[in-house]
Swiss-Prot record:
InterPro entries: Amidase/PGRP_sf, Amidase_domain, Peptidoglycan_recognition, PGRP, PGRP_domain_met/bac. Residues 46-174 form the N-acetylmuramoyl-L-alanine amidase domain. Homodimer; disulfide-linked. The modification Pyrrolidone carboxylic acid is found at Q22. Keywords: Antibiotic, Antimicrobial, Disulfide bond, Fungicide, Immunity, Innate immunity, Pyrrolidone carboxylic acid, Secreted, Signal. This is Peptidoglycan recognition protein 1. Pfam families: Amidase_2 (PF01510). It is found in: Secreted; Cytoplasmic granule. It comes from Bos indicus. The lineage of its organism: Eukaryota, Metazoa, Chordata, Craniata, Vertebrata. GO terms for molecular function: N-acetylmuramoyl-L-alanine amidase activity; peptidoglycan binding; peptidoglycan immune receptor activity; zinc ion binding.
Length: 190
């Protein structure tokens, strides 16, 4: 027996599918984590082809409260110590499995130098991953964020993931996290 759908049913199915494809999961807004107001004004041209994954090399956080504090600490360091207009990353990932909005999808980051900042989204895992791996929940959060970015047109469908060390002289994103992202389907070496 074949199924026949009315035009209204097709519209409903399309809307349901569109919603599922664009679900961005849990992104903690700047307001929710207590961010200072951004002074950044440069827009990021979209869709973006590259994503640079780094680690903060600082303290690990594994609860929403500790990750909110850590996001504030990173922003404080970038703004007050380095003199930047905001936290350098577009997004931060906590070991609580949540994504924390940094500069977001639309604002030029300060994460990978003058060559890569204008053409890449910067995602940084909060913690030091030289000798340990992030928990599965944090890795899933990053993958969901990337899928969301592609579904919503912030990233090109053929976007490429790079490790921070692929584009700059650094140990970031740490040896263990770097091994993991090299297995991701969109990872490409420079």
């Amino acid at each position: 027996m074949s199924r026949r759908y009315t035009p209204l049913a097709w519209v409903l199915l399309a809307l349901l599918g569109l919603g599922a494809a664009q679900d961005c999961g849990s992104i903690v807004s700047r307001g929710k984590w207590g961010a200072l107001a951004s002074k950044c004004s440069q827009r990021l041209r979209q869709p973006v082809r590259y994503v640079v994954v780094s680690h903060t090399a600082g303290s690990v956080c594994n609860t929403p409260a500790s990750c909110q504090r850590q996001a504030q600490n990173v922003q404080h360091y970038h703004v007050r110590e380095r003199g930047w207009c905001d936290v350098g990353y577009n997004f931060l990932i906590g070991e609580d499995g949540l994504v924390y909005e940094g500069r977001g999808w639309n604002t030029l980051g300060a994460h990978s130098g003058p060559t890569w900042n204008p053409i890449a989204i910067g995602i940084s895992f909060m913690g030091n991953y030289m000798h340990r791996v992030p928990p599965a929940s944090a890795l899933r959060a990053a993958q969901s964020l990337l899928a969301c970015g592609a579904a919503r047109g912030y990233l090109t469908p053929n976007y490429e993931v790079k490790g921070h060390r692929d584009v700059q002289q650094t140990l970031s994103p740490g040896d263990e996290l770097y091994k993991i992202i090299q297995q991701w389907p969109h990872y490409r070496r420079v």
